[in-house]
From Swiss-Prot:
InterPro entries (alphabetical): CTU2, Rossmann-like_a/b/a_fold
Keyword annotations from UniProtKB, A to Z: Cytoplasm, tRNA processing
Protein name from the UniProt record: Cytoplasmic tRNA 2-thiolation protein 2
Function description: Plays a central role in 2-thiolation of mcm(5)S(2)U at tRNA wobble positions of tRNA(Lys), tRNA(Glu) and tRNA(Gln). May act by forming a heterodimer with NCS6/CTU1 that ligates sulfur from thiocarboxylated URM1 onto the uridine of tRNAs at wobble position.
Compartments it resides in: Cytoplasm
Organismal lineage: Eukaryota, Metazoa, Ecdysozoa, Arthropoda, Hexapoda
Organism: Drosophila virilis (Fruit fly)
GO cellular component, one term: cytosol
HAMAP family, per database record: CTU2
GO aspect biological process, one term: protein urmylation
Main location: cytoplasm
Length: 400
């Protein structure tokens, strides 16, 4: 039993509470000797729990994590066609730089694959910063990669090369959803569907997603809270095979943390230009609050975030038995969880009570109430539980 009582929390605050550990900021030392190669350097990078390293030793360490993630699981076959997602975030630029470096090495060390770069334009208003100038700078720096752009919500045939792209106004379904939580979840699923369609269009067999440990920890908690527990393992795993057309999504930066990403940005003088989700953290949604919670943990208790993230590696993905045949959600492509279960029935029962209200008291018919709950559970049987929750927030129109 816990021996800490209320008296232990006096005017001095939580005396026995967990104390903040190492921050994620790290230290850049102006000059000194590298603890790994022994050479003098004008700038040393001091990561938490690692000795100070010179510019080249740090880059070798970070790039090894990228190569090790792909090599340990043998997830990327030789001469694979890869679609790399660049959204302007720091981690996406790090992944782009690492992949370009791996492709420009000698034959022995070269990563043997062909890469194309995709940017999904999700600007909701013309007043937002135009990403095209920054993308053109990246195209020149990382030649000969081909850069493609497509608008979120557009048809796949509207995919354009960066040099030929011009934005147009589209009618967005997410504006028809009542809550910000539902809108953000829908945009995430819509984005995944579009990525899979573009990969098929460009004949790419693999997609590189720039997710790091802290973002995957936030995604794990968010998926559980949204009712996606059956597919949470694939949401944070190195390999996700739910995209259409047997396209495989890979997360080769999953072992990098925020501190390593920021040091890499500084070392390579990269310029992130994304300001979308991170700027919305003041708006209340389940995703934003979870991200803020994990960011605070990462700042004060970095090892706790690692524990949350590593939990995802121990969760097995829920799969349909082979004899039952494939049965996936029409929106998120996860295995359907809409079978009759006590938990889902209880949720729909509660909703039915709220809907019937006074009529329930007048009729006093519990059988009708349970029948109503079963009908709700069996309706939209092509959607999983979480995607049905999105549909419930839809004011008009259709999700798909």
């Amino acid at each position: 039993m816990c021996s800490i009582g209320e008296d232990d929390f006096g005017d001095e605050g939580a005396t026995h509470a967990m104390l903040p550990g190492s921050s994620t900021v790290g230290t850049v030392i102006t000059a000194g000797s590298c603890n790994k190669c022994g050479l003098n350097s004008l700038e040393l990078y001091k990561l938490n729990f690692r000795a100070a390293e010179c510019h080249q030793c740090f880059l070798s360490y970070a790039r090894h994590k990228f190569r090790a993630a792909l090599g340990a699981a043998k997830a990327l076959p030789r001469n694979a066609e890869v679609l790399l997602l660049v959204d302007g975030s720091a981690e996406s630029l790090v992944l782009l730089d690492m992949l370009h470096f791996a492709q420009t090495q000698n034959t022995f060390k070269r990563l043997h694959c062909s890469a194309r770069v995709l940017h999904i334009d999700a600007q909701s208003s013309p007043s937002e910063n135009d990403p095209l100038p920054m993308l053109n700078e990246l195209r020149e720096r990382y030649a000969p990669f081909e850069f493609y752009v497509i608008q979120l919500g557009a048809e796949v045939h509207s995919l354009k090369l960066l040099k030929d792209y011009s934005a147009s106004r589209l009618d967005s379904t997410d504006n028809k959803l009542r809550s910000l939580t539902a809108r953000q979840d829908y945009v995430r699923q819509q984005r995944k569907r579009l990525i899979g369609a573009v990969a098929l269009q460009l004949q790419c067999t693999h997609v590189f997603e720039p997710s790091i440990s802290s973002s995957l920890a936030a995604q794990l908690l968010t998926s559980v809270a949204l009712g996606r527990g059956g597919s949470v393992a694939l949401d944070v795993a190195l390999l996700d095979d739910r995209l259409q057309g047997a396209v495989t999504l890979l997360r080769p930066l999953k072992d990098l943390n925020e501190q390593e990403v920021q040091f890499y940005i500084k070392a390579q003088q990269l310029k992130p230009f994304r300001s979308d989700e991170s700027s919305l953290l003041s708006d209340a949604s389940l995703q934003n609050l979870t991200s803020a919670f994990v960011a605070n943990l990462q700042l004060n208790y970095a090892s706790t975030v690692s524990t949350v993230f590593r939990t995802g590696d121990k969760i097995a993905a829920k799969r349909q038995p082979i004899e039952e045949g494939p049965s996936t959600c029409a929106l998120c492509q996860s295995d359907l969880d809409s079978g009759l279960s006590d938990t889902l029935l209880a949720i729909e029962y509660s909703r039915a009570v709220s809907e019937m209200g006074v009529a329930l008291q007048q009729q006093n018919n519990m059988e009708a109430l349970e029948q109503r709950a079963r009908e709700r559970l069996n309706s939209m049987d092509n959607l999983c539980h979480a995607c049905r929750n999105i549909h419930a927030e839809l004011t008009h129109g259709s999700l798909i």
